[in-house]
Amino acid sequence: REEFFITTKIWIDNYGYEKCKASVEESLKKLKTDYIDLVLLHQPFSDYYGAYRALEELYEEGKIRAIGVSNFYPDRLADMCLFGRKVVPAVNQVETNPLNQQVKAQENMEKYGVHIEAWAPFGEGKNNMFSNPTLVEIGKKYNKSAAQVILRWLIQRGVIIACKSIHKERMEENFKVFDFELSNEDMEAIKALDTSDSLFFNHQEPSMVEWFDKMVYERRDK
């Protein structure tokens, strides 16, 4: 078991103290394990306070080894780290890629001892990410793909990476990023690509909160 690092997320449907506890217990049964390494709260909406209290208790019981959050923007992250919180989030998983680099967000997380974790490090290929001239040219210097350049860039920034693939060859490629190092010039060139705009959606928009609320209630009605 110790050779695997297992992460799971709590969806909004299971927020609130009792529901969150029940959700983790169900995950433990399904995974057939005594503990989960990291449990994340998926969104900063609904009763995430109650859910977080449940995770703190499960942490103290040894059933989870670390608590994390996802998509928590700076003010909500600060709220989760202050006010006598028993356990500070270990990570905050946010969209992070060359076009949305989250530099200020990372600085804010470091202030509270929270590690940044990137979801959508490749932006799901949006905006021609894999054929971006800057990334492709840097890759040619090291005989690496644009995807490998992105992963290496994140590693050198101290960003934890959550990337996935269903293709074995791409999984293998994703591991081959420890045999080269980007120069300062390379890092600056990638830094210049930042637009600070999401390739997906803005969690601070009221319309986005309304969308999540509608989705949760539609799921309950099924």
Predicted regions: what is each one?
Residues 43-222:
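Beta/alpha (TIM)-barrel catalytic core signal, keyed to glycine-rich beta->alpha loops juxtaposed to Asp/Glu
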Residues 3, 33-36, 64, 89:
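Local beta-strand N-terminus motif with an aromatic residue
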Residues 16-31, 50, 77, 101:
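Short, acidic/polar
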Residues 2-14, 37-44, 71, 95:
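A short, structured active-site edge motif that brings together acidic residues
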Residues 14-15, 34, 99, 146:
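Hydrophobic alpha-helical elements and their junctions with loops/disorder across both membrane
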Residues 20-40, 57-61, 83:
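CE4/NodB-like, metal-dependent polysaccharide N-deacetylase domain
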